[in-house]
């Protein structure tokens, strides 16, 4: 997952290479994007993963010992322990013009420990999103989405296979569009013929 998401939006657990991809990672990335929208610039524009971790801890504060349990690398844990103490910044002061509820949501999305980070359901119920979310008007997928399409003959698809499949899809779409256009043209011609008679 090192390259799944741009560094500036990577959750600490990705930077520390200690997590399977989870929804908590997406919540972190979404929090970074929301902060960027409010501040009109990236919140954590790290130059490399160490710089990225330093920027994160300067903004959200250094993690305490209990928040390091998910860090499986001793080296990474030692690095985090040696960081100078930094208390969390107040997002309301960081974004004084922003809706305080937006700042509250960002603060809950950008928690170092993925287990303590707000989840999707809590995000959707957050007062900042109240006007955008209606439980009674919630689209629901017919079936869980899988990424099985990424597998090809028992392994990950090569770049060439992806290109070939995209081209195949485009050709099929082109045929459908042309068929519909021909059908439409035929219907129009038929209508014109009846008008002439």
Q: Each predicted region: which residue ranges?
A:
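Conserved activation segment of eukaryotic-like protein kinases, specifically the C-terminal portion
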Residues: 1-14
């Amino acid at each position: 997952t090192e390259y799944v998401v741009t560094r500036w939006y990577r959750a600490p657990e990705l930077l520390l290479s200690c997590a399977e991809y989870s929804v908590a990672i997406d919540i972190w990335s979404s929090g970074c994007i929301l902060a960027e929208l409010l501040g009109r610039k990236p919140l954590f524009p790290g130059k490399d993963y160490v710089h990225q971790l330093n920027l994160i801890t300067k903004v959200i504060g250094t993690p305490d010992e209990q928040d390091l349990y998910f860090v499986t690398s001793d080296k990474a844990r030692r690095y985090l322990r040696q960081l100078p103490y930094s208390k969390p910044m107040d997002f309301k002061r960081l974004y004084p013009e922003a809706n305080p509820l937006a700042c509250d949501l960002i603060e809950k999305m950008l928690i170092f420990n993925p287990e303590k980070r707000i989840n999707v359901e809590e995000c959707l119920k957050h007062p900042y999103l109240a006007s955008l979310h209606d439980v009674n008007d919630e689209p629901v997928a017919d079936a869980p989405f899988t990424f099985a399409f990424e597998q090809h003959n028992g392994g990950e698809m090569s770049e060439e296979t992806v290109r070939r499949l995209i081209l195949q899809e485009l050709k099929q779409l082109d045929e459908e569009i042309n068929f519909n256009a021909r059908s439409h043209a035929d219907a129009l011609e038929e209508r014109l013929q009846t008008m002439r008679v």
